[in-house]
C-alpha cells in the first residue's frame, strides 16, 4: 500500500490526512485534529465520528506511555508520525496516533457521530448496535463516543487489528471534511496520576461539543484562566 493515501481514494472527494499532517509537534496535531472525521469501514458501511477531544503526549514527560521506555507493545509510539497506536484502557480499546518525534503521540479522547452521504443513518445504527447502553438499548447519540473506549467500541476499532498499523484509505483513515472549531478549550489531561506531569495543559476540546466529551471542562465550578483556557481559531496554544 502506498504511504500517500491520496493515490487510492475510497470516493472522489475524500480527503484523507497525509502522513505529513501527523509528523509534526504533538500539541499542534492534537489541536488540529479537532473537527476531523475518523472513518472506519465495516462491510459496506463507513462508520464515522468527528473528533471533539484529544490529548497530546511526549516522550520526555511522565504522563506518557513512551516515558516508560520502548517495548514491542509500544513500538508504534516510536515510529514515524501517522502510525496507529492502540492499547487497552479500563478494559476497552483506545486509539492514538504517533506524532513527530520518537515517543510522541495524540490520544483520541472522544468523538461525536458524524452523518453525511457517505456515513448515513444506517452506519449510525451499526455504531449504536456495537456500543449499546448497560441495558442493551441504543445509546443516545451524544454519549455514543463520549470517551476513548466508547469511541473505539462504537467505531469497531480493535487493538489486535490496528495497533502499529498505518492508515488504509480503503478501511480506516482520518478525513478532512472542512470543519474547524471556532473556539477550542485547552486544559490539563484527565486521569494522569499525581506526580506524573498531571498539570500540563495538553488536552484540547472543541468548545461546541464540550457537553459530549469525556468530562465537560465547562461544568459548574470550573473557572476560565484557572481550570481551562479558551482559544480562538487563530490563538496560539499554551506550551
Swiss-Prot record:
Keyword set, alphabetical order: DNA damage, DNA repair, Hydrolase
GO terms of molecular function: alkylbase DNA N-glycosylase activity; DNA binding
Any GO BP: base-excision repair
Keyword Cell membrane in record: no
One Pfam family hit: Pur_DNA_glyco
Gene3D superfamilies given in the database record: Methylpurine-DNA glycosylase (MPG)
Keyword DNA damage carried by entry: yes
Membrane-spanning residues: none
Annotated EC: 3.2.2.-
Similarity annotation: Belongs to the DNA glycosylase MPG family.
Protein name (database record): Putative 3-methyladenine DNA glycosylase
Amino acid at each position: 500500500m502506498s504511504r500517500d493515501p491520496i493515490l487510492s481514494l475510497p470516493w472522489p472527494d475524500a480527503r484523507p490526512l497525509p502522513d505529513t499532517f501527523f509528523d509534526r509537534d504533538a500539541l499542534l496535531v492534537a489541536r488540529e485534529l479537532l473537527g476531523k472525521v475518523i472513518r472506519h469501514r465495516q462491510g459496506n458501511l463507513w462508520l464515522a465520528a468527528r473528533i471533539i477531544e484529544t490529548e497530546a503526549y511526549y516522550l520526555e514527560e511522565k504522563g506518557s506511555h513512551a516515558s516508560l521506555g520502548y517495548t514491542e507493545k509500544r513500538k508504534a509510539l516510536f515510529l514515524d508520525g501517522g502510525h496507529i497506536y492502540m492499547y487497552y484502557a479500563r478494559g476497552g480499546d483506545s486509539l492514538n496516533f504517533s506524532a513527530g518525534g520518537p515517543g510522541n503521540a495524540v490520544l483520541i479522547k472522544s468523538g461525536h457521530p458524524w452523518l453525511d452521504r457517505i456515513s448515513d443513518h444506517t452506519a449510525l445504527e451499526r455504531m449504536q448496535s456495537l456500543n449499546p447502553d448497560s441495558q442493551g438499548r441504543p445509546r443516545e447519540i451524544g454519549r455514543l463516543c463520549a470517551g476513548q473506549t466508547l469511541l473505539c467500541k462504537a467505531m469497531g476499532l480493535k487493538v489486535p487489528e490496528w495497533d502499529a498499523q498505518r492508515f488504509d484509505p480503503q478501511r480506516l483513515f482520518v478525513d478532512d471534511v472542512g470543519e474547524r472549531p471556532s473556539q477550542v478549550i485547552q486544559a490539563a489531561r484527565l486521569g494522569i496520576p499525581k506526580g506524573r506531569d498531571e498539570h500540563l495543559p495538553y488536552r484540547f476540546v472543541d468548545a461546541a461539543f464540550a457537553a459530549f466529551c469525556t468530562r465537560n471542562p465547562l461544568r459548574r465550578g470550573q473557572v476560565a484562566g484557572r481550570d481551562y483556557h479558551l482559544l480562538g481559531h487563530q490563538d496560539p496554544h499554551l506550551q
